[in-house]
């Protein structure tokens, strides 16, 4: 990710990866990082330079393992292929944006991770708060919330009328089960056997404690069927939706 205005303050080039790792070690006041993520892919980044840098950081002890985040399945496959061919450190975990509102990773990313033995730790299981059902369709979001602040990323992704309506249906089902919509959503992610764990993103201590309570809820087949009915496997909650930060690149018009 970009961490400044300089030309070498972003991307997956060797200089920036090395510098960013050293900066992280200094800020964390530690000798090594357990898992160092390539947080997003830059498809024009030299694959060999990127992967060999991760291997160098591993061999010199600055990181124990590295992972991939927001990588397309074909890029995951390319990284694994290069690592195997050149006997360098392999990625051990993938961090996709995956929740009951966005099931697109089920098409290629999750099967690829399973095939290559890569752990999966999805982020944003609550769809930036939408799956807590605290946002009512047609009602202004509460002050102090992410939507209430008109967060740009949320407004261009999760905060859609279709998603808000689905969250209310999940809430009604969850309450009949004696739990909350948020707890249901977290457990839905964990109920996928391909997933290793899940990344929680609480903003307050109360939110963190509420995350932990989610583990007390036992997911069942009826919950799985509900989400399948509301959001078909492999699809987002809104037909035709795609995150503008991660556009599809499979069409290059000859004339436009």
Placement of each model-derived feature along the sequence:
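Conserved, mostly hydrophobic/aromatic
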Residues: 24, 33, 46, 66, ...
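Terminal-tail/helix-coil boundary detector
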Residues: 143-176, 191-195, 205, 209-256
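Glycine-rich beta-alpha junction loops
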Residues: 1, 72, 98-102, 124-131, ...
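Short, hinge-like loop/turn segments at secondary-structure boundaries
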Residues: 12-14, 83-87, 110-112, 137-141, ...
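Glycine/proline-rich, positively charged
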Residues: 2-104, 108
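Aromatic-lined glycan-binding groove of carbohydrate-active enzymes
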Residues: 105-145, 180
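Conserved active-site loop/cleft motifs that coordinate metal ions or position small ligands
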Residues: 182-185, 197-201
């Amino acid at each position: 990710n970009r961490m400044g205005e300089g030309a070498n303050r972003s991307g997956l080039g060797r200089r920036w990866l090395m510098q960013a790792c050293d900066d992280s070690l200094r800020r964390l006041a530690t000798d090594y990082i357990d898992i160092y993520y390539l947080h997003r892919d830059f498809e024009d980044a030299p694959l060999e330079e990127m992967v060999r840098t991760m291997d160098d950081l591993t061999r010199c002890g600055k990181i124990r393992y590295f992972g991939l985040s927001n990588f397309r399945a074909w890029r995951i496959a390319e990284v694994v292929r290069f690592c195997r061919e050149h006997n360098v450190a392999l990625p051990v975990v993938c961090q996709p944006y995956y929740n009951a509102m966005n099931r697109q990773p089920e098409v290629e990313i999750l099967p690829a991770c399973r095939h290559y033995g890569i752990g999966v730790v999805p982020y944003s299981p609550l769809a930036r708060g939408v799956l807590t059902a605290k946002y009512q369709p047609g009602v202004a979001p509460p002050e102090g919330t992410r939507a209430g602040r008109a967060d740009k990323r949320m407004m261009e992704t999760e905060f859609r009328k279709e998603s808000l309506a689905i969250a209310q249906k999940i809430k009604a089902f969850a309450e009949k089960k004696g739990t909350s919509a948020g707890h249901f959503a977290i457990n839905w992610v964990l109920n996928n056997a391909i997933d290793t764990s899940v990344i929680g993103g609480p903003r307050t201590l109360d939110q963190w404690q509420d995350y932990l309570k989610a583990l007390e809820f036992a997911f069942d087949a009826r919950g799985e069927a509900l989400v399948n009915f509301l959001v078909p496997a492999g699809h987002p909650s809104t037909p035709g939706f795609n995150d503008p930060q991660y556009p599809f690149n499979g069409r290059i018009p000859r004339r436009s």
